[in-house]
Protein backbone atom coordinates (compact mmCIF):
# COMPACT_ATOMS: atom_id res chain seq x y z
CA UNK A 1 0.00 0.00 0.00
CA UNK A 2 2.82 2.41 0.90
CA UNK A 3 4.63 1.84 -2.39
CA UNK A 4 1.50 2.61 -4.32
CA UNK A 5 0.99 5.86 -2.40
CA UNK A 6 4.56 7.06 -3.17
CA UNK A 7 4.25 6.37 -6.85
CA UNK A 8 1.01 8.25 -6.96
CA UNK A 9 2.65 11.38 -5.37
CA UNK A 10 5.47 11.36 -7.93
CA UNK A 11 3.02 11.03 -10.75
CA UNK A 12 0.99 13.98 -9.48
CA UNK A 13 4.09 16.18 -9.23
CA UNK A 14 5.15 15.36 -12.73
CA UNK A 15 1.68 16.17 -13.89
CA UNK A 16 1.74 19.59 -12.28
CA UNK A 17 5.21 20.25 -13.71
CA UNK A 18 4.14 19.43 -17.19
CA UNK A 19 1.10 21.65 -16.80
CA UNK A 20 3.26 24.55 -15.60
CA UNK A 21 5.62 24.14 -18.51
CA UNK A 22 2.76 24.18 -20.90
CA UNK A 23 1.60 27.47 -19.31
CA UNK A 24 5.14 29.18 -19.80
CA UNK A 25 6.31 29.24 -16.20
CA UNK A 26 9.99 28.55 -15.32
CA UNK A 27 12.72 29.49 -12.80
CA UNK A 28 14.09 33.07 -13.13
CA UNK A 29 17.16 33.86 -15.22
CA UNK A 30 20.47 34.82 -13.66
CA UNK A 31 20.63 38.54 -12.78
CA UNK A 32 23.70 40.75 -13.61
CA UNK A 33 25.50 43.22 -11.34
CA UNK A 34 26.09 46.46 -13.27
CA UNK A 35 28.28 48.60 -11.02
CA UNK A 36 28.99 49.81 -7.54
CA UNK A 37 29.84 53.46 -6.94
CA UNK A 38 30.84 55.51 -3.91
CA UNK A 39 30.37 59.28 -3.94
CA UNK A 40 32.89 59.98 -1.20
CA UNK A 41 34.47 56.76 0.16
CA UNK A 42 32.00 56.82 3.07
CA UNK A 43 29.00 55.14 1.45
CA UNK A 44 28.43 53.27 -1.76
CA UNK A 45 25.57 51.88 -3.86
CA UNK A 46 25.37 48.85 -6.13
CA UNK A 47 22.99 48.31 -9.08
CA UNK A 48 21.97 45.18 -10.95
CA UNK A 49 19.86 44.15 -13.92
CA UNK A 50 17.24 41.41 -13.37
CA UNK A 51 16.74 38.60 -15.85
CA UNK A 52 13.52 36.92 -17.05
CA UNK A 53 11.24 36.01 -14.18
CA UNK A 54 9.92 32.77 -15.77
CA UNK A 55 6.29 33.92 -15.77
CA UNK A 56 6.13 33.96 -12.03
CA UNK A 57 6.64 36.67 -9.45
CA UNK A 58 10.38 36.89 -8.65
CA UNK A 59 12.03 38.23 -5.56
CA UNK A 60 15.62 39.69 -5.73
CA UNK A 61 17.96 39.76 -2.80
CA UNK A 62 21.60 40.98 -2.50
CA UNK A 63 23.94 39.17 -0.21
CA UNK A 64 27.58 39.91 0.58
CA UNK A 65 30.40 38.94 2.83
CA UNK A 66 33.72 40.63 3.52
CA UNK A 67 37.03 39.14 2.54
CA UNK A 68 38.30 36.76 5.20
CA UNK A 69 34.83 36.25 6.77
CA UNK A 70 32.32 33.42 6.37
CA UNK A 71 29.25 35.25 7.67
CA UNK A 72 26.89 36.26 4.85
CA UNK A 73 24.96 39.54 5.10
CA UNK A 74 21.95 40.81 3.20
CA UNK A 75 21.64 44.29 1.71
CA UNK A 76 20.78 46.81 4.45
CA UNK A 77 18.78 49.25 2.23
CA UNK A 78 16.92 48.48 -1.02
CA UNK A 79 15.13 51.83 -1.27
CA UNK A 80 17.71 54.70 -1.03
CA UNK A 81 19.49 53.85 -4.23
CA UNK A 82 16.32 53.25 -6.21
CA UNK A 83 14.91 50.08 -7.82
CA UNK A 84 17.24 47.14 -8.31
CA UNK A 85 19.87 48.74 -6.07
CA UNK A 86 21.39 48.36 -2.64
CA UNK A 87 22.67 51.23 -0.52
CA UNK A 88 25.46 50.80 2.03
CA UNK A 89 25.46 53.41 4.72
CA UNK A 90 28.48 54.53 6.75
CA UNK A 91 27.72 51.82 9.28
CA UNK A 92 28.06 49.08 6.71
CA UNK A 93 30.91 50.64 4.69
CA UNK A 94 34.52 49.79 5.36
CA UNK A 95 37.20 51.35 3.15
CA UNK A 96 39.85 48.82 4.14
CA UNK A 97 37.86 45.67 3.30
CA UNK A 98 37.10 43.87 0.06
CA UNK A 99 33.40 43.05 -0.53
CA UNK A 100 32.14 39.94 -2.34
CA UNK A 101 28.62 40.75 -3.60
CA UNK A 102 26.03 38.41 -5.19
CA UNK A 103 22.40 38.97 -6.40
CA UNK A 104 19.84 36.13 -6.11
CA UNK A 105 16.52 35.79 -8.05
CA UNK A 106 13.83 33.56 -6.43
CA UNK A 107 10.37 32.47 -7.63
CA UNK A 108 8.16 29.42 -7.29
CA UNK A 109 10.05 27.51 -9.94
CA UNK A 110 13.54 27.97 -8.50
CA UNK A 111 16.50 30.22 -7.61
CA UNK A 112 19.19 31.88 -9.83
CA UNK A 113 22.34 33.69 -8.62
CA UNK A 114 24.59 36.22 -10.43
CA UNK A 115 28.35 36.04 -10.73
CA UNK A 116 30.15 37.42 -7.67
CA UNK A 117 31.52 41.00 -7.86
CA UNK A 118 34.60 42.03 -5.88
CA UNK A 119 34.41 45.63 -4.74
CA UNK A 120 36.95 47.90 -2.99
CA UNK A 121 35.48 51.20 -1.92
CA UNK A 122 38.63 53.20 -2.70
CA UNK A 123 38.51 52.31 -6.41
CA UNK A 124 34.78 52.70 -7.02
CA UNK A 125 34.54 56.41 -6.20
CA UNK A 126 32.41 58.34 -8.68
CA UNK A 127 31.57 61.80 -7.37
CA UNK A 128 28.51 63.79 -8.12
CA UNK A 129 28.74 66.50 -10.82
CA UNK A 130 29.99 69.89 -9.64
CA UNK A 131 27.26 72.18 -8.40
CA UNK A 132 26.42 75.87 -8.74
CA UNK A 133 27.82 76.36 -12.25
CA UNK A 134 27.96 80.13 -12.98
CA UNK A 135 28.83 82.01 -16.25
CA UNK A 136 29.70 85.71 -16.33
CA UNK A 137 31.32 88.18 -18.78
CA UNK A 138 34.07 90.36 -17.34
CA UNK A 139 35.27 93.67 -18.83
CA UNK A 140 38.41 94.76 -16.97
CA UNK A 141 39.94 98.11 -17.86
CA UNK A 142 43.54 96.98 -18.09
CA UNK A 143 42.93 93.67 -19.88
CA UNK A 144 40.83 92.10 -22.58
CA UNK A 145 37.25 91.00 -21.74
CA UNK A 146 36.75 87.31 -20.98
CA UNK A 147 34.16 84.74 -19.90
CA UNK A 148 34.39 83.80 -16.25
CA UNK A 149 33.16 80.27 -15.32
CA UNK A 150 32.74 79.38 -11.67
CA UNK A 151 31.44 76.24 -9.87
CA UNK A 152 31.41 74.39 -6.54
CA UNK A 153 32.79 70.92 -5.68
CA UNK A 154 30.37 67.99 -5.33
CA UNK A 155 28.26 68.21 -2.18
CA UNK A 156 28.94 64.67 -0.99
CA UNK A 157 32.70 64.83 -1.52
CA UNK A 158 34.93 66.04 1.29
CA UNK A 159 37.44 68.18 -0.61
CA UNK A 160 38.34 70.59 2.18
CA UNK A 161 39.88 67.92 4.41
CA UNK A 162 42.17 66.75 1.59
CA UNK A 163 40.54 63.34 1.46
CA UNK A 164 40.06 63.80 -2.27
CA UNK A 165 42.00 65.46 -5.09
CA UNK A 166 39.47 66.46 -7.72
CA UNK A 167 40.21 67.15 -11.38
CA UNK A 168 37.70 69.15 -13.41
CA UNK A 169 36.90 69.15 -17.09
CA UNK A 170 34.98 72.04 -18.68
CA UNK A 171 33.59 71.98 -22.15
CA UNK A 172 31.87 74.77 -24.12
CA UNK A 173 30.72 75.43 -27.64
CA UNK A 174 28.52 77.79 -29.61
CA UNK A 175 24.91 76.70 -29.61
CA UNK A 176 24.89 75.73 -33.28
CA UNK A 177 28.31 74.08 -33.26
CA UNK A 178 28.89 70.34 -33.01
CA UNK A 179 32.40 70.20 -31.52
CA UNK A 180 33.16 70.99 -27.92
CA UNK A 181 36.12 73.00 -26.73
CA UNK A 182 37.54 71.37 -23.59
CA UNK A 183 39.67 72.77 -20.76
CA UNK A 184 41.16 71.01 -17.74
CA UNK A 185 41.86 72.39 -14.27
CA UNK A 186 43.19 70.86 -11.05
CA UNK A 187 41.74 71.88 -7.68
CA UNK A 188 40.55 75.16 -9.16
CA UNK A 189 36.88 76.09 -9.14
CA UNK A 190 37.03 78.88 -11.76
CA UNK A 191 38.22 79.38 -15.31
CA UNK A 192 38.70 82.32 -17.70
CA UNK A 193 37.91 81.88 -21.39
CA UNK A 194 39.22 84.37 -23.97
CA UNK A 195 38.75 84.73 -27.73
CA UNK A 196 35.02 84.20 -27.92
CA UNK A 197 32.99 84.94 -31.02
CA UNK A 198 30.73 87.95 -30.54
CA UNK A 199 27.00 87.51 -31.07
CA UNK A 200 27.08 83.78 -30.26
CA UNK A 201 25.30 81.84 -27.49
CA UNK A 202 27.65 79.45 -25.66
CA UNK A 203 26.73 76.23 -23.82
CA UNK A 204 28.89 75.14 -20.89
CA UNK A 205 29.10 71.83 -18.95
CA UNK A 206 31.43 70.55 -16.28
CA UNK A 207 32.35 67.25 -14.61
CA UNK A 208 34.90 66.02 -12.09
CA UNK A 209 37.03 62.98 -11.29
CA UNK A 210 38.92 61.94 -8.12
CA UNK A 211 42.47 60.74 -8.15
CA UNK A 212 41.27 57.09 -7.92
CA UNK A 213 37.89 56.56 -9.46
CA UNK A 214 35.63 57.46 -12.35
CA UNK A 215 34.48 60.61 -14.08
CA UNK A 216 31.23 61.96 -12.80
CA UNK A 217 28.25 62.70 -14.96
CA UNK A 218 28.16 65.97 -16.86
CA UNK A 219 26.42 68.75 -15.11
CA UNK A 220 23.30 70.28 -16.66
CA UNK A 221 24.02 72.71 -19.51
CA UNK A 222 24.43 76.40 -18.74
CA UNK A 223 24.27 79.06 -21.48
CA UNK A 224 25.38 82.68 -21.97
CA UNK A 225 24.95 85.21 -24.81
CA UNK A 226 28.07 87.01 -26.07
CA UNK A 227 27.32 90.63 -27.18
CA UNK A 228 28.14 91.80 -30.68
CA UNK A 229 30.60 94.46 -29.53
CA UNK A 230 32.71 91.89 -27.73
CA UNK A 231 36.33 92.29 -28.97
CA UNK A 232 37.74 89.12 -30.41
CA UNK A 233 41.52 89.62 -30.66
CA UNK A 234 43.92 92.48 -30.23
CA UNK A 235 45.65 92.36 -33.62
CA UNK A 236 47.25 95.81 -33.47
CA UNK A 237 50.49 94.46 -32.01
CA UNK A 238 50.76 91.73 -34.64
CA UNK A 239 50.12 94.24 -37.40
CA UNK A 240 52.93 96.42 -36.07
CA UNK A 241 55.32 93.46 -35.91
CA UNK A 242 54.45 92.41 -39.46
CA UNK A 243 55.02 95.92 -40.85
CA UNK A 244 58.36 96.24 -39.05
CA UNK A 245 59.54 92.87 -40.35
CA UNK A 246 58.59 93.79 -43.91
CA UNK A 247 60.53 97.06 -43.69
CA UNK A 248 63.64 95.27 -42.42
CA UNK A 249 63.46 92.71 -45.22
CA UNK A 250 63.11 95.43 -47.85
CA UNK A 251 66.15 97.27 -46.48
CA UNK A 252 68.25 94.10 -46.58
CA UNK A 253 67.21 93.28 -50.15
CA UNK A 254 67.94 96.83 -51.27
CA UNK A 255 71.40 96.77 -49.65
CA UNK A 256 72.28 93.45 -51.25
CA UNK A 257 71.09 94.56 -54.68
CA UNK A 258 72.98 97.85 -54.40
CA UNK A 259 76.31 96.20 -53.62
CA UNK A 260 75.83 93.47 -56.20
CA UNK A 261 76.13 90.59 -53.80
CA UNK A 262 73.96 87.51 -53.86
CA UNK A 263 71.88 86.44 -50.91
CA UNK A 264 73.78 83.18 -50.62
CA UNK A 265 77.10 85.04 -50.42
CA UNK A 266 75.78 87.29 -47.68
CA UNK A 267 74.25 84.52 -45.63
CA UNK A 268 76.95 81.90 -46.29
CA UNK A 269 80.27 83.60 -47.12
CA UNK A 270 82.73 81.52 -49.15
CA UNK A 271 85.68 79.79 -47.55
CA UNK A 272 88.80 81.96 -47.93
CA UNK A 273 91.49 80.57 -50.22
CA UNK A 274 95.13 79.94 -49.26
CA UNK A 275 97.13 83.12 -48.79
CA UNK A 276 100.67 81.79 -49.28
CA UNK A 277 103.10 84.16 -50.95
CA UNK A 278 103.87 82.93 -54.45
CA UNK A 279 101.27 80.16 -54.28
CA UNK A 280 99.35 79.85 -57.54
CA UNK A 281 96.10 77.92 -57.31
CA UNK A 282 95.93 77.44 -61.08
CA UNK A 283 99.22 75.54 -61.08
CA UNK A 284 97.86 73.19 -58.46
CA UNK A 285 94.65 72.62 -60.41
CA UNK A 286 96.58 71.93 -63.65
CA UNK A 287 98.79 69.39 -61.89
CA UNK A 288 102.06 71.31 -62.46
CA UNK A 289 103.69 70.32 -59.21
CA UNK A 290 107.23 71.23 -60.33
CA UNK A 291 106.34 74.84 -61.01
CA UNK A 292 104.42 74.97 -57.75
CA UNK A 293 107.39 73.68 -55.78
CA UNK A 294 109.69 76.06 -57.61
CA UNK A 295 107.44 78.94 -56.60
CA UNK A 296 107.52 77.81 -53.00
CA UNK A 297 111.31 77.38 -53.03
CA UNK A 298 111.74 80.95 -54.23
CA UNK A 299 110.49 82.24 -50.88
CA UNK A 300 112.76 83.04 -48.00
CA UNK A 301 112.35 79.62 -46.45
CA UNK A 302 115.25 77.91 -44.66
CA UNK A 303 116.87 74.95 -46.45
CA UNK A 304 115.04 71.71 -45.90
CA UNK A 305 118.18 69.59 -45.47
CA UNK A 306 120.97 69.92 -42.95
CA UNK A 307 124.65 69.08 -43.13
CA UNK A 308 124.14 65.43 -42.27
CA UNK A 309 121.81 64.91 -45.23
CA UNK A 310 124.29 66.63 -47.53
CA UNK A 311 127.15 64.50 -46.26
CA UNK A 312 125.19 61.34 -46.84
CA UNK A 313 124.79 62.24 -50.51
CA UNK A 314 128.57 62.17 -51.20
CA UNK A 315 130.79 59.11 -51.55
CA UNK A 316 133.11 58.36 -48.68
CA UNK A 317 136.79 58.49 -49.72
CA UNK A 318 139.36 56.71 -47.61
CA UNK A 319 142.63 54.86 -47.91
CA UNK A 320 142.38 51.30 -46.69
CA UNK A 321 145.38 49.57 -45.17
CA UNK A 322 144.21 46.21 -46.49
CA UNK A 323 144.07 47.49 -50.04
CA UNK A 324 147.61 48.90 -49.90
CA UNK A 325 149.07 45.77 -48.32
CA UNK A 326 147.27 43.32 -50.64
CA UNK A 327 149.84 41.54 -52.82
CA UNK A 328 149.63 41.99 -56.54
CA UNK A 329 148.27 38.94 -58.33
CA UNK A 330 151.04 36.98 -59.99
CA UNK A 331 151.55 37.03 -63.69
CA UNK A 332 151.03 33.32 -63.86
CA UNK A 333 147.50 33.58 -62.53
CA UNK A 334 146.79 36.36 -64.96
CA UNK A 335 147.97 34.37 -67.89
CA UNK A 336 145.93 31.36 -66.81
CA UNK A 337 142.77 33.49 -66.72
CA UNK A 338 142.23 33.28 -63.00
CA UNK A 339 140.76 36.49 -61.64
CA UNK A 340 142.18 37.90 -58.40
CA UNK A 341 139.99 37.70 -55.36
CA UNK A 342 138.65 41.01 -54.12
CA UNK A 343 138.05 42.00 -50.58
CA UNK A 344 134.58 42.30 -49.16
CA UNK A 345 134.08 46.00 -49.47
CA UNK A 346 131.76 48.05 -47.40
CA UNK A 347 128.67 48.80 -49.40
CA UNK A 348 127.97 51.93 -47.43
CA UNK A 349 131.36 53.58 -47.92
CA UNK A 350 131.04 54.04 -51.66
CA UNK A 351 134.19 52.06 -52.36
CA UNK A 352 132.26 48.97 -53.26
CA UNK A 353 130.44 50.60 -56.13
CA UNK A 354 133.55 52.23 -57.56
CA UNK A 355 135.70 49.11 -57.12
CA UNK A 356 133.21 47.03 -59.08
CA UNK A 357 135.05 45.60 -62.10
CA UNK A 358 131.99 45.84 -64.29
CA UNK A 359 131.41 49.50 -63.42
CA UNK A 360 135.06 50.40 -63.97
CA UNK A 361 135.19 48.55 -67.24
CA UNK A 362 132.08 50.34 -68.49
CA UNK A 363 133.48 53.71 -67.49
CA UNK A 364 136.85 52.96 -69.03
CA UNK A 365 135.30 51.80 -72.29
CA UNK A 366 133.73 55.21 -72.80
CA UNK A 367 136.16 57.41 -74.72
CA UNK A 368 136.94 60.83 -73.38
CA UNK A 369 137.00 63.53 -75.96
CA UNK A 370 138.66 66.05 -73.68
CA UNK A 371 140.58 64.65 -70.73
CA UNK A 372 140.41 66.50 -67.48
CA UNK A 373 143.06 69.09 -66.85
CA UNK A 374 144.80 69.72 -63.59
CA UNK A 375 145.31 73.40 -62.90
CA UNK A 376 146.82 75.49 -60.25
CA UNK A 377 144.68 76.97 -57.48
CA UNK A 378 144.97 80.41 -59.07
CA UNK A 379 143.07 79.43 -62.20
CA UNK A 380 140.73 76.48 -61.67
CA UNK A 381 138.51 75.44 -64.48
CA UNK A 382 135.20 73.61 -64.49
CA UNK A 383 135.25 69.89 -65.05
CA UNK A 384 134.20 68.92 -68.50
CA UNK A 385 133.03 65.45 -67.49
CA UNK A 386 132.38 65.49 -63.73
CA UNK A 387 130.18 62.42 -63.70
CA UNK A 388 132.92 60.17 -65.05
CA UNK A 389 135.49 61.54 -62.63
CA UNK A 390 133.19 61.18 -59.63
CA UNK A 391 132.31 57.61 -60.57
CA UNK A 392 135.86 56.36 -60.76
CA UNK A 393 137.02 57.68 -57.43
CA UNK A 394 139.11 54.56 -56.83
CA UNK A 395 141.12 54.71 -60.04
CA UNK A 396 144.91 54.29 -59.79
CA UNK A 397 147.47 57.08 -60.17
CA UNK A 398 150.30 57.33 -62.67
CA UNK A 399 153.11 59.81 -63.07
CA UNK A 400 155.16 60.63 -66.12
CA UNK A 401 158.81 60.39 -65.34
CA UNK A 402 160.17 61.46 -68.66
CA UNK A 403 158.57 64.87 -68.65
CA UNK A 404 158.82 65.24 -64.86
CA UNK A 405 155.21 66.41 -64.86
CA UNK A 406 152.67 64.26 -62.94
CA UNK A 407 149.55 63.21 -64.77
CA UNK A 408 146.59 61.27 -63.47
CA UNK A 409 144.59 58.47 -65.01
CA UNK A 410 140.86 59.02 -64.51
CA UNK A 411 139.85 55.55 -65.66
CA UNK A 412 141.85 52.39 -65.27
CA UNK A 413 141.27 48.70 -64.83
CA UNK A 414 140.67 47.32 -61.41
CA UNK A 415 143.82 45.15 -61.54
CA UNK A 416 145.98 48.29 -61.61
CA UNK A 417 144.92 49.34 -58.12
CA UNK A 418 147.16 46.81 -56.39
CA UNK A 419 150.74 48.17 -55.96
CA UNK A 420 153.94 46.14 -56.01
CA UNK A 421 155.14 44.84 -52.67
CA UNK A 422 157.96 47.08 -51.49
CA UNK A 423 160.42 46.78 -48.69
CA UNK A 424 159.70 48.65 -45.51
CA UNK A 425 162.41 51.18 -46.27
CA UNK A 426 160.58 52.40 -49.33
CA UNK A 427 157.23 52.97 -47.62
CA UNK A 428 156.37 56.54 -46.99
CA UNK A 429 154.74 57.52 -43.70
CA UNK A 430 151.04 56.74 -43.58
CA UNK A 431 148.52 59.53 -43.35
CA UNK A 432 145.43 59.50 -41.19
CA UNK A 433 143.30 61.53 -43.56
CA UNK A 434 139.68 60.61 -43.46
CA UNK A 435 137.95 63.06 -45.70
CA UNK A 436 138.11 64.93 -48.96
CA UNK A 437 140.01 67.99 -47.79
CA UNK A 438 142.96 65.97 -46.41
CA UNK A 439 143.20 63.97 -49.61
CA UNK A 440 143.19 67.09 -51.76
CA UNK A 441 145.86 68.90 -49.81
CA UNK A 442 147.98 65.76 -49.69
CA UNK A 443 147.64 65.31 -53.44
CA UNK A 444 148.73 68.89 -54.12
CA UNK A 445 151.68 68.53 -51.80
CA UNK A 446 152.76 65.27 -53.39
CA UNK A 447 152.59 66.79 -56.83
CA UNK A 448 155.01 69.60 -55.91
CA UNK A 449 157.28 67.29 -53.99
CA UNK A 450 157.55 64.83 -56.85
CA UNK A 451 158.67 67.52 -59.22
CA UNK A 452 161.31 68.76 -56.76
CA UNK A 453 162.63 65.31 -55.99
CA UNK A 454 163.02 64.44 -59.65
CA UNK A 455 165.16 67.50 -60.21
CA UNK A 456 167.41 66.75 -57.26
CA UNK A 457 168.20 63.03 -57.58
CA UNK A 458 167.49 60.26 -60.04
CA UNK A 459 167.03 57.81 -57.25
CA UNK A 460 163.85 59.48 -56.05
CA UNK A 461 162.58 59.53 -59.63
CA UNK A 462 163.21 55.82 -59.93
CA UNK A 463 161.31 55.15 -56.68
CA UNK A 464 158.39 57.31 -57.79
CA UNK A 465 158.22 55.54 -61.13
CA UNK A 466 158.20 52.15 -59.42
CA UNK A 467 155.43 53.20 -57.07
CA UNK A 468 153.16 54.66 -59.69
CA UNK A 469 153.64 52.18 -62.50
CA UNK A 470 151.20 49.25 -62.54
CA UNK A 471 153.75 46.51 -63.08
CA UNK A 472 153.00 46.02 -66.68
CA UNK A 473 155.24 46.75 -69.60
CA UNK A 474 155.47 50.19 -71.17
CA UNK A 475 153.60 49.06 -74.25
CA UNK A 476 150.52 48.16 -72.21
CA UNK A 477 150.63 51.53 -70.49
CA UNK A 478 150.84 53.42 -73.77
CA UNK A 479 148.02 51.34 -75.23
CA UNK A 480 145.75 52.11 -72.25
CA UNK A 481 146.55 55.79 -72.56
CA UNK A 482 145.72 55.77 -76.28
CA UNK A 483 142.29 54.18 -75.61
CA UNK A 484 141.20 57.13 -73.50
CA UNK A 485 141.46 55.61 -70.05
CA UNK A 486 144.22 58.04 -69.09
CA UNK A 487 144.04 61.81 -68.96
CA UNK A 488 147.10 63.98 -69.54
CA UNK A 489 147.49 67.64 -68.80
CA UNK A 490 147.85 70.20 -71.51
CA UNK A 491 151.21 71.50 -72.43
CA UNK A 492 150.29 75.01 -71.28
CA UNK A 493 149.43 73.94 -67.80
CA UNK A 494 151.46 76.02 -65.41
CA UNK A 495 152.60 74.21 -62.29
CA UNK A 496 153.56 76.14 -59.20
CA UNK A 497 157.17 75.97 -58.16
CA UNK A 498 157.62 74.21 -54.88
CA UNK A 499 159.36 75.97 -52.07
CA UNK A 500 162.99 75.30 -51.58
CA UNK A 501 162.66 74.27 -47.96
CA UNK A 502 159.48 72.22 -48.32
CA UNK A 503 159.95 68.74 -46.84
CA UNK A 504 159.26 65.71 -48.96
CA UNK A 505 156.26 64.42 -46.96
CA UNK A 506 154.95 65.80 -43.72
CA UNK A 507 154.93 63.20 -40.99
CA UNK A 508 152.24 65.05 -39.04
CA UNK A 509 149.00 63.03 -39.16
CA UNK A 510 145.85 64.82 -40.16
CA UNK A 511 142.66 64.39 -38.17
CA UNK A 512 139.11 64.47 -39.51
CA UNK A 513 138.30 67.45 -41.64
CA UNK A 514 136.12 70.29 -40.41
CA UNK A 515 133.06 71.43 -42.29
CA UNK A 516 133.49 75.13 -42.86
CA UNK A 517 130.12 75.91 -44.40
CA UNK A 518 127.49 74.72 -46.85
CA UNK A 519 126.46 77.19 -49.51
CA UNK A 520 122.93 77.64 -50.85
CA UNK A 521 123.82 75.66 -53.99
CA UNK A 522 124.78 72.61 -51.93
CA UNK A 523 128.58 73.12 -52.16
CA UNK A 524 130.44 71.66 -49.19
CA UNK A 525 133.48 73.70 -48.07
CA UNK A 526 136.06 71.71 -46.05
CA UNK A 527 139.46 72.38 -44.44
CA UNK A 528 141.68 70.00 -42.43
CA UNK A 529 142.08 70.09 -38.69
CA UNK A 530 145.34 68.93 -37.09
CA UNK A 531 145.83 67.42 -33.71
CA UNK A 532 148.76 69.59 -32.83
CA UNK A 533 149.23 73.21 -33.72
CA UNK A 534 152.78 74.51 -33.98
CA UNK A 535 153.30 78.17 -33.72
CA UNK A 536 150.64 80.76 -34.39
CA UNK A 537 147.16 79.76 -35.60
CA UNK A 538 147.04 79.32 -39.32
CA UNK A 539 144.29 80.24 -41.73
CA UNK A 540 143.09 77.38 -43.92
CA UNK A 541 141.89 77.48 -47.47
CA UNK A 542 138.51 76.19 -48.52
CA UNK A 543 138.80 73.37 -51.05
CA UNK A 544 135.33 73.14 -52.50
CA UNK A 545 135.89 72.61 -56.24
CA UNK A 546 136.62 69.15 -57.69
CA UNK A 547 139.47 69.20 -60.23
CA UNK A 548 139.87 65.54 -61.11
CA UNK A 549 140.25 62.01 -59.76
CA UNK A 550 143.68 60.37 -59.69
CA UNK A 551 144.56 56.76 -60.35
CA UNK A 552 145.23 56.09 -56.67
CA UNK A 553 141.63 56.64 -55.66
CA UNK A 554 142.31 60.25 -54.66
CA UNK A 555 139.84 63.05 -55.25
CA UNK A 556 141.69 66.25 -56.12
CA UNK A 557 140.10 69.48 -54.88
CA UNK A 558 141.22 73.03 -55.60
CA UNK A 559 140.26 76.28 -53.88
CA UNK A 560 137.27 78.14 -55.23
CA UNK A 561 138.14 81.81 -55.84
CA UNK A 562 134.55 82.91 -55.36
CA UNK A 563 134.29 81.05 -52.06
CA UNK A 564 137.58 82.55 -50.90
CA UNK A 565 136.42 86.06 -51.74
CA UNK A 566 133.23 85.52 -49.78
CA UNK A 567 135.20 84.11 -46.87
CA UNK A 568 137.49 87.12 -46.83
CA UNK A 569 134.51 89.42 -46.69
CA UNK A 570 132.74 87.51 -43.92
CA UNK A 571 135.64 86.54 -41.66
CA UNK A 572 138.59 88.60 -40.42
CA UNK A 573 141.88 88.26 -42.21
CA UNK A 574 144.07 85.49 -40.92
CA UNK A 575 147.59 84.41 -41.61
CA UNK A 576 147.92 82.15 -44.64
CA UNK A 577 148.67 78.52 -43.73
CA UNK A 578 151.88 76.93 -44.99
CA UNK A 579 151.63 74.75 -48.04
CA UNK A 580 151.01 71.11 -47.29
CA UNK A 581 153.67 68.74 -48.56
Swiss-Prot record:
Motif Box 1 motif boundaries:
267-275
Q: Which residues lie on this side of the membrane: Cytoplasmic?
A: 259-581
Which stretches of this protein does UniProt put in the Extracellular compartment? 25-237
Q: Membrane topology type, per the record?
A: Single-pass type I membrane protein
Q: Name one GO molecular function term.
A: peptide hormone binding
Q: Where is this motif: WSXWS motif?
A: 215-219
TM ranges are: 238-258
Q: In which tissues is it expressed?
A: Expressed in all tissues examined; liver, peripheral blood lymphocytes, endometrium, corpus luteum, intestine, fetal thymus, fetal spleen, fetal liver and fetal brain.
Spell out the Basic and acidic residues composition-biased ranges: 329-349, 375-384, 469-483
Q: Name one GO cellular component term.
A: plasma membrane
User: Where do the record's region annotations for Disordered lie?
Assistant: 324-384, 458-499
Similarity annotation? Belongs to the type I cytokine receptor family. Type 1 subfamily.
Domains: what does the record tell us?
The WSXWS motif appears to be necessary for proper protein folding and thereby efficient intracellular transport and cell-surface receptor binding.
Q: Which PANTHER family match?
A: CYTOKINE RECEPTOR (PTHR23036), PROLACTIN RECEPTOR (PTHR23036:SF86)
**Subunit details:** Interacts with SMARCA1. Interacts with NEK3 and VAV2 and this interaction is prolactin-dependent.
Q: What is this protein called?
A: Prolactin receptor
Instruction: Identify the species of origin.
Output: Bos taurus (Bovine)
Amino acid sequence: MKENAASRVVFILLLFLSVSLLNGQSPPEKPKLVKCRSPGKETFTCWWEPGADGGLPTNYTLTYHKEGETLIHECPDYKTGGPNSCYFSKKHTSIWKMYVITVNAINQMGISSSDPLYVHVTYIVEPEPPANLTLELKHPEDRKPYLWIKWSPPTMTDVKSGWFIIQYEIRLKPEKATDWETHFTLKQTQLKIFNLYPGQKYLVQIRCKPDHGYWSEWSPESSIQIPNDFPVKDTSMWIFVAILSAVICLIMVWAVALKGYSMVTCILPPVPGPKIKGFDVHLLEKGKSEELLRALESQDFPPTSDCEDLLMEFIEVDDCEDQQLMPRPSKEHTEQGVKPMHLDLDSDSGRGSCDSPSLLSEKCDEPQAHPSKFHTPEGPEKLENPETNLTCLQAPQSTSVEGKIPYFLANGPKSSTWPFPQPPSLYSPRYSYHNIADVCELALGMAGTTATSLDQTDQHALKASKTIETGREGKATKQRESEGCSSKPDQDTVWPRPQDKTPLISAKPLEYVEIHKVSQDGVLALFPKQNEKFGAPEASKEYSKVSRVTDSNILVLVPDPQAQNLTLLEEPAKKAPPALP
